[in-house]
Swiss-Prot record:
Belongs to the major facilitator superfamily. Organophosphate:Pi antiporter (OPA) (TC 2.A.1.4) family. This is Probable hexose phosphate transport protein. Coiled coil: none annotated. It comes from Chlamydia muridarum (strain MoPn / Nigg). It is found in: Cell membrane. Transport protein for sugar phosphate uptake. GO terms for biological process: phosphate ion transmembrane transport. One of its GO terms (cellular component) is plasma membrane.
Length: 456
């Protein structure tokens, strides 16, 4: 047994509890405990992921770096995080989420502390790259827990509520770093999130567990007595038996259901450009407001918090509208929201010569609203528009493109802002939003049925 297996191996299933009342009571308790633990755990991952973003303006003043150098540091995280998201997904499937998620959070905390102790670009790149790799340990264990503890019929609701942890983390970190900078400079803005996340990592070890079966509880489908049949498929028993008999080969997943799936290519390219806009607004808008409108760090960061809060509402509404108005098709809402994104970016750019902080905050709120809807639904649509046995690979495929887009928002956009000023920056954002819209358009009527016609 190697060290990895010894530390991270999932616990064995234990004998199932026979008392139905005790099972019900235990399930209720553990579902609540597991959910709040992974929810707040992921909020804290955001603290160590975004600390540098909001420490940037003060770091420029202290160390004299230019935007291109800062862009290199920012891009490093997105590249290592993008690769890790895929690799860690495979690793996490064979690991106990209790230790996997906690270890990731503790190491991101340490990376932030070492970053705060550094003063040169190579060291910043090293520690921010390590941070990016272990940031990839946050999402996969949550996916495992959401799948094991919440049944198919309710998972959408739990998934959307869990997804708001991104926005809550994103909204809190500007405030936390703003206060830390006022009292302890940019280094304090790295130390404080780092220390908090190390503490939270140990709390996760205490609070989280693996599957229901590891606690003597039945599988969630058995507990919920859920009929897993699908309107387009044969009976549940037939399906389960067929799936047990034959898994798809890696070749089938990649070449039949992912690489040859036109919908995934459209979604992946859209994902690239949506993520350029998302990360550009998140990473550069505070600096834009400070440089062009002379806002204080706290006021600029408050405006960026509104971007995340807008995203929270947009995400929940987009999912609900795609279920009700467009009957489960994600394409129409992706197109409508992308159109709204174009106009809201134009609105923010239109206020460049006026310093009205509430107007800037309102436009950032609206941009977040229209951006986070399609960003959330790309992964959902990718999973739905591929074979169920290829859903993870399909989501990972769009995720790779997303984080290449995020990396593009670092050095390349930093260079654009450096050479062509903030007007050039906004032109680049508008171009990306328009291209994303064009890639969403062909997916307007995409559905499982249209995939079958395409595949056969």
């Amino acid at each position: 047994m190697n060290l990895w297996t010894k530390i991270f191996q999932p616990p064995r299933h234990i004998k199932e509890i026979s008392d139905p009342e005790l099972v019900k009571k235990q399930y209720k308790y553990w579902r609540v405990r597991i959910f709040y633990s992974m929810f707040f755990g992921y909020v804290f991952f955001y603290f160590t992921r975004k600390s540098f973003t909001f420490a940037m303006p003060t770091l420029i003043a202290d160390l004299g770096f230019d935007k291109a150098q800062l862009g290199i540091i920012g891009s490093t995280l997105y590249i290592t995080y993008g690769i890790s998201k895929f690799v860690s997904g495979v690793m996490s499937d064979q690991s106990n989420p209790r230790y996997f998620m906690a270890t990731g959070l503790i190491i991101t905390g340490l990376s932030n502390i070492f970053f705060g102790l550094s003063s040169t670009v190579p060291l910043f790149v090293l520690f921010w790259g390590i941070n990016g790799w272990f940031q990839g340990w946050g999402w996969p264990p949550c996916a495992r827990l959401l799948t094991h503890w919440y049944s198919k019929s309710e998972r959408g609701t739990w998934w959307s509520v869990w997804s708001t942890s991104h926005n809550i983390g994103g909204a809190l970190i500007p405030v936390l770093t703003g206060i830390a900078i006022d009292y302890a400079g940019w280094r304090g803005a790295m130390f404080i999130p780092g220390i908090i996340c190390i503490i939270m990592g140990f709390i996760l070890i205490d609070r989280l567990r693996d599957t229901p079966q590891s606690l003597g509880l039945p599988a969630i489908e058995k507990f919920k007595k859920e009929d897993l049949s699908h309107p387009h498929e044969e009976t549940t028993a037939d399906i389960l038996e067929e799936e047990a008999e034959r898994e798809l080969s890696t070749k089938e997943i990649l070449f039949t259901y992912v690489l040859s799936n036109k919908w995934l290519w459209f979604l992946s390219f859209a994902s690239f450009f949506i993520y350029v806009v998302r990360m550009a607004v998140n990473d550069w808008s505070a600096l834009y407001l400070i440089e062009t409108k002379n806002y204080s760090t706290v006021k600029a960061n408050l405006c960026v918090s509104l971007f995340e809060i807008g995203g929270l509402f947009g995400m929940l509404l987009a999912g609900w509208l795609s279920d009700t108005i467009s009957k489960g098709k994600r394409g129409p809402m992706n197109v409508v929201f992308s159109l709204g994104l174009l106009f809201s970016i134009l609105g923010l750019w239109g206020t460049h010569d006026r310093s009205i902080w509430w107007a800037d905050g309102a436009f950032l709120f609206i941009i977040g609203f229209f951006l986070f809807g399609p960003q959330m639904m790309i992964g959902l649509a990718a999973a739905e528009l591929s074979h169920k046995k290829a859903a993870g690979t399909a989501s990972g495929f769009t995720g790779w493109f997303a984080y290449f887009g995020a990396a593009f928002a670092g050095y390349p956009l930093g260079k654009v802002a450096q050479d062509w000023g903030w007007h050039g920056f906004f032109v680049a954002l508008l171009a990306c939003a328009l291209i994303a819209l064009l890639f969403f358009l062909p997916t307007w009527n995409a559905s499982e049925q249209s995939l079958r016609k395409h595949s056969h």
